From Swiss-Prot:
Gene3D superfamilies: Ribosomal protein L33. HAMAP family: Ribosomal_bL33. One of its GO terms (biological process) is translation. Pfam families: Ribosomal_L33. This is Large ribosomal subunit protein bL33. The gene is rpmG. It comes from the Bacteria. InterPro entries: Ribosomal_bL33, Ribosomal_bL33_sf, Ribosomal_zn-bd. Belongs to the bacterial ribosomal protein bL33 family. GO terms for cellular component: cytoplasm; ribonucleoprotein complex; ribosome.
Length: 49
């Protein structure tokens, strides 16, 4: 089963992206994505919806 999550910018805290992941995965996801508020690429970490 997959659960929906959001990806939050580590610098400004804005939730910019939404995705899903496997429920059995223990580690948190983190990606380098573009943040329109910061106007640059930053690390986005997994948070609950």
């Amino acid at each position: 089963m997959r659960v929906k999550i959001s990806l939050k910018c580590s610098e400004c805290g804005k939730k910019n992206y939404y995705t899903d992941k496997n429920k059995t995965a223990k580690e948190k996801l983190s990606f380098r994505r573009y943040c329109p508020k910061c106007n640059k690429h930053t690390v986005h970490s997994e948070t609950k919806l």
